[in-house]
Amino acid sequence: MISLTQNEIIKILLKKKMLLIVMLLLIFVSLLSYGQKYSYDNNIKKFEAESGGVAYDWKALTTQRLDDLEERSNNEFIPKEVRASIDREIQQLNYFIENDINPITPTASKFNVQFVEQGITLFIPLLIVILAADLVSNEFSKKTIKILLTRAVPRWKILLSKYIALIIMTTILVFIIAVLATLVSYLFFQQWGFSEPIVTGFNLVEGELNSNSTILISRFQYTLLIYSLLWFVSIVIASITLMISVLVDNSSSAIGILMAALIGGQFLQFFLSEWKLVKYFFVTNLDLTRYLTGSYQPIEGMSLNFSILTLSAWAVLSLVISFTVFNRKDVLV
């Protein structure tokens, strides 16, 4: 099994897709870091110009942001779920001001978390799809599966070795994302920020903000928590991608199907949020990070435990289908 897994890892590396993914990550992280730094510098210049040359003060900007949020929260026409999400941000900003913690100045730790929060539902899953979509389908399209199955090795072992290799490469990819996001953003911001405290554990109960379970942790701990959730989501996406790769003999079709599912799922949760079955679709459960911040939930009845169980069910079902179909698939065609 070890030699089979090593062989599959070498196959993935020889395709040079990991190099392509790293290059894409480097470009996106650099652009986003530069954009955030540029926006921050512009805000400082704007503040100093409007205040008649008064030096930049993060507390003044935070207070201004706080006033804007309180004005929005007092709007009687917004949904109570949205108001609860705004109230959560108000509580956090008040805590930062009272404890002299700067929440505005960008740091590597803040960028790290923001990058995962924004990319966990589409961008990062697409990278996993690029990595894994042709894992099995390419063997069938190039007819190399016949050579692979001539060995005295059971089919399930061959597929298991591919899956183990995929898990290893997915784990490496998540690690690369963390390293690139940290180092590149630090080059722009010149601050790590991992020792800063952050309040987390907010949740929505029947549209109302519940802060009874909030805890104070460092940004380093919070970053580890965020990346743990990202790793779990990535493994689920990898499992589903493996299933599609087994079911479809063409790698381009596999990528197309998965891209359509990821993009289409984003539309489903906003335009068909009242349809009860939508919350069981894997795409609507990918954003696990929103449960840590108490963000607005577009679909009622969803929680962190619900999403983890739903995604786990999708992963297990995908593996069952993958092994069942692969063991019975006709390779003579």
Walk through the language-model features, giving the residues of each:
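Hydrophobic/aromatic residues in alpha-helical transmembrane segments
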Residues: 128-132, 145, 180, 240, ...
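Junction motif at the cytosolic side of a transmembrane helix
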Residues: 6-15, 240-247, 312-333
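Short hydrophobic, aromatic-rich alpha-helical segments embedded in or entering the lipid bilayer
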Residues: 276-294
